[in-house]
């Protein structure tokens, strides 16, 4: 999948598959209207069920929760394991774990998470390929 974060206008211009919105459900309906039914429109929903449910009801193809570990980003709250477990049990929309992931968190979330979004965990590592391999191995 090729997607861009927030920049809806770039999706069609560059032939991308979709967009990853960072404001939960707030701009989801407009993105769906502008990009059409075939585009992948996902939403980052922070750490709350409410935000995720709102995005799913607005037509998100997936929701992402995070951060999943200690990070300087955000307000210090973390997406808890039980959020992912509840979501995977109750909601059909795929769920992504995002932000501050390490092999232990990945292993703990693997059974209840559809996908993982790795970023700084890989790109900030001294050996990005080795870091990615450790994270992928933790999925099981």
Feature locations, PLM:
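Catalytic cores of alpha/beta
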Residues: 2, 6-17, 47-61, 90-97, ...
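Alpha-helix-loop-beta-strand connector modules within alpha/beta enzyme cores
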Residues: 1-4, 23-47, 76-102, 135-140
